[in-house]
Amino acid sequence: MDHEGCQGQHPQQCCQWVSNAWSEFLDLLKNAETLDIVIMLLGYIAMHLTFVSLFLSMRKMGSKFWLGICTLFSSVFAFLFGLVVTTKLGVPISVILLSEGLPFLVVTIGFEKNIVLTRAVMSHAIEHRRIQAQNSKSGKRSPDGSTQNMIQYAVQAAIKEKGFEIIRDYAIEIVILVIGAASGVQGGLQQFCFLAAWTLFFDFILLFTFYTAILSIKLRSTVSSVMSICVWPLRMMASRRVAENVAKGDDELNRVRGDAPLFGRKSSSIPKFKVLMILGFIFVNIVNICSIPFRNPSSMSTIRTWASSLGGVIAPLSVDPFKVASNGLDAILPTAKSNNRPTLVTVLTPIKYELEYPSIHYALGSAASNPAYNDAFHHHFQGYGVGGRMVGGILKSLEDPVLSKWIVIALALSVALNGYLFNVARWGIKDPNVPEHNIDRNELARAREFNDTGSATLPLGEYVPPTPMRTQPSTPAITDDEAEGLHMTKARPANLPNRSNEELEKLLSENALREMTDEEVISLSMRGKIPGYALEKTLGDFTRAVKIRRSIIARNKAAADITHSLDRSKLPYENYNWERFFGACCENVIGYMPLPVGVAGPLVIDGQSYFIPMATTEGVLVASASRGCKAINSGGGAITVLTADGMTRGPCVAFETLERAGAAKLWLDSEAGQDMMKKAFNSTSRFARLQSMKTALAGTNLYIRFKTTTGDAMGMNMISKGVEHALSVMANDGGFDDMQIISVSGNYCTDKKAAALNWIDGRGKGVVAEAIIPGEVVRSVLKSDVDSLVELNVAKNLIGSAMAGSVGGFNAHAANIVAAIFLATGQDPAQVVESANCITIMKNLNGALQISVSMPSLEVGTLGGGTILEPQGAMLDILGVRGSHPTNPGDNARRLARIIGAAVLAGELSLCSALAAGHLVRAHMQHNRSAAPSRSTTPGSSHDARLTGHDQCPRALSVNNVDERRRYSEVKAIDE
């Protein structure tokens, strides 16, 4: 009976404590000022924003959940340790004090140290893996190539790099908090500073112990997962390249295997864990034995006295009686002064009255009247010293029903976490660099033959005629991050039973397409159950979706006679980050088109050197531009001037009568109309700013040409959004509700079409580039002279283009350079039509050649569109113009326009020089004609065979050899 009363006492005390805390909180809230409540609310909001910032920072480093939650656990443990030490030292800490101080402590201190340490560890791990990859490519075997050594290296290097900085920050913060604890300021500042100092101390310890261990485990788990994903499919596929590499390295692997231990590489994680457990058990027993002289409770009196004195120094009284009695003292003092007599006042400690139910006193009385259980419990463990009393206290606390449930939950979580950690340690035992079995050369040869002669599988119930076997295309290089772009198709058992159409449709309705084979998905798609455009969204695997779409197109009866070889064509589709394409750049994807990219230069533009990336299939184009760059650099480089920056959009609106259309035109041309439209347009974007509007009337149709800046984006979508809103404001607020919007784009822009309006009024960026080439450089590098170039430019670029009625085409080949740079940097290739508008002017300036190009409608951007793709973004990186400019939006796009203008200048200079010297045809015959043996991969007609046979006669070969030598010497002289 006594035992039950003891058990029932704890829940009542907990409920009473919660009730008291809630009532104190309500009293505090009622008596608090509005400003204090607002400050506390802002503090809590800032604290939660700090948590969000922590998870966002960890997400950028590759951890969506675990590192962030482990950081919070580490900080919570540090706070609990600090709270225990503070209360044991006699410093009173209330819930109100914690609720008021913790948000500001979290916001002030934050989790920057954990983020800094994590970033350093990850960067050193990536650096270590890159060094390993370089060594493996060069044939070197690194002695520290294992995952465990990589993690050890990353942690040690990170601590060496950032350890002093972290310790310094901790020391400064703890010193400041100690000063606050010793300041003597009342109101809870001393107690909270004391608690915060201990919390930071334990946070420092846990950062380099608990959190570092979790970080190492996370790194090991990530590396093990990546290795298992990459190694397992390669073993199953047994491709030709893997077979050759393994066969060539068989002797070396045997040598390594001979030096390795019998059971593979040893993983020291589990043995170390066992040793630490045994040492901990021994340490507990040693402490228990050493505590025998101190089993007398009186021997601890000194420590208790010191702790209580320290608590008395730091902790003031919980209630200040003079503050409570301030109202009474204020009333007594004037009375004493008026009566002119001394008054003695005694201030007593306030008494707090609480209303409780009588049942509480009955329960407390029954428990207090039967202390036999408590006395027996303490008497039983009294003779066992400090360790015995500690164990006794723990056993007694287990009798609390609430606490026991939490302990069971904690034990369950501990078991689950330990199981996960042991699995991670078990993964580390196997070394992925050492094969698990002997390599059978016969099996490798059979696998090679299988890969070389693999035939396509037929769809269900449909026959497709076989196609001639083609050579296996080379594997394209990985263009994006391997961790993001590598998608392996799930292996399918070869002996899987065929499912009926009803079963397949049932799986489709259950969204279980991942359980189907490729042939089953193809069958459903060809029967119209899965739309071909929705394969990526339906399958959830972009690479597999592209592969299946190729097979579907190859088997489509409408064009099977010409597309039957698509699924085995040399158009690559693997090892590409298709997520960037989806919903942004292309639909119905069947692969990607590798395009050669070269660089021309370096070219000095406005005092800075650039290498110009150019994606082209035209021979000698990059070489010609490089020769022009060399000549321009010899004259001091190119100078550019930006003359305009404004993208245009020309909508078409209509009215019922010409009178209304004319009134609308006059209103748009007026100052009031301009102001209203500009205000409406500018409200749609923080980058788009309307510069001007130009109107034209054709009958009852009114064309309005909006011209606006668009930041670093090319801006077509941005300006279209602004035009729609401005026209809506014009109809509703401008008094033209009878206006009918025919089209947002009325070809008055003019976009992707040759138009005199773009040539006259400009569109996009307007750029003029100039260079002065000394006469000696013209003769030595360009193999021409100044007067010949000036004469050729007038006759060809000026008079010749005028005779042809050209609009903006007064140049030699500006579109060549513009198109190549557009493809390399992710610009819109269709806008080469107006972007290549250019006039080239040459003059003889005191014996030197002065050349300039003027391009009034260059439409480029460094943000959005094709620039989101990693290869194109990499080309923008080498120009230093990727993305939006951090301080002045629009500068990156304007700099790209200057670079393109200077590159066009180099191309114009080189081509005109080649034309003047008569080198153009010979250079193209040398570099821009494919060799005859390239026809061997494509079946040709009998006519092609006759031509090929004629070209291979001994006489033709002898003549070609002489021509080749002569052309090579001439082109080499041109390039030099």
UniProtKB/Swiss-Prot annotation:
Active-site residues per Swiss-Prot or TrEMBL entry: 618 (charge relay system), 752 (charge relay system), 828 (charge relay system), 924 (proton donor)
Membrane-crossing segments per the record: 37-57, 65-85, 91-111, 170-190, 194-214, 273-293, 402-422
One GO biological process term: ergosterol biosynthetic process
Cytoplasmic side: 58-64, 112-169, 215-272, 423-976
Residues annotated for NADP(+) binding in this entry: 685-687, 712-720, 928-929
Keywords: Endoplasmic reticulum, Lipid biosynthesis, Lipid metabolism, Membrane, NADP, Oxidoreductase, Steroid biosynthesis, Steroid metabolism, Sterol biosynthesis, Sterol metabolism, Transmembrane, Transmembrane helix
Molecular-function GO terms, alphabetical: hydroxymethylglutaryl-CoA reductase (NADPH) activity
Catalyzed chemical reaction(s): (R)-mevalonate + 2 NADP(+) + CoA = (3S)-3-hydroxy-3-methylglutaryl-CoA + 2 NADPH + 2 H(+)
Pfam families the UniProt entry points to: HMG-CoA_red, Sterol-sensing
PANTHER family the UniProt entry points to: 3-HYDROXY-3-METHYLGLUTARYL-COENZYME A REDUCTASE
Function of the molecule: HMG-CoA reductase; part of the first module of ergosterol biosynthesis pathway that includes the early steps of the pathway, conserved across all eukaryotes, and which results in the formation of mevalonate from acetyl-coenzyme A (acetyl-CoA). In this module, the cytosolic acetyl-CoA acetyltransferase catalyzes the formation of acetoacetyl-CoA. The hydroxymethylglutaryl-CoA synthase then condenses acetyl-CoA with acetoacetyl-CoA to form HMG-CoA. The rate-limiting step of the early module is the reduction to mevalonate by the 3-hydroxy-3-methylglutaryl-coenzyme A (HMG-CoA) reductase HMGR.
Protein name, per record: 3-hydroxy-3-methylglutaryl-coenzyme A reductase
Organism lineage: Eukaryota, Fungi, Dikarya, Ascomycota, Pezizomycotina
